[in-house]
Curated annotation (Swiss-Prot):
Belongs to the acyl carrier protein (ACP) family. GO terms for cellular component: cytosol; membrane. This is Acyl carrier protein. Keywords: Cytoplasm, Fatty acid biosynthesis, Fatty acid metabolism, Lipid biosynthesis, Lipid metabolism, Phosphopantetheine, Phosphoprotein. SUPFAM superfamilies: ACP-like. It is found in: Cytoplasm. It comes from Rhodococcus erythropolis (strain PR4 / NBRC 100887). NCBIfam families: AcpM, PRK00982.1-1, PRK00982.1-2, PRK00982.1-4. InterPro entries: ACP (IPR003231), ACP-like_sf (IPR036736), Meromycolate-ACP (IPR053393), PP-bd_ACP (IPR009081). Pathway: Lipid metabolism; fatty acid biosynthesis. The lineage of its organism: Bacteria, Bacillati, Actinomycetota, Actinomycetes, Mycobacteriales. One of its GO terms (molecular function) is acyl carrier activity. Residues 6-81 form the Carrier domain. Its main location: cytoplasm. Pfam families: PP-binding.
Amino acid sequence: MAHTQEEIIAELGQIVEEVTGIEPSEVTVDKSFVDDLDIDSLSMVEIAVQTEDKYGVKVPDEDLAGLRTVGDIVAYIQKLEAEGAEAKNAE
């Protein structure tokens, strides 16, 4: 099942709070993890791992480096979910 942008942001907010203590309300689509939320690289890896577990996706390290904003991760998850649905439908 594909998730909406709002669902992903809400769930990502919970993950960010668990990892960093930042309030979920601070996690909005236009926020940069490093510049706006002041999240370090170690915390970003933990957020990525929990996001992978939550959505059943794999984010390669080279892709993770390009995911700088909350919106970037939302779009990436939606893309992976769409690709997964297409692959399932092709079977």
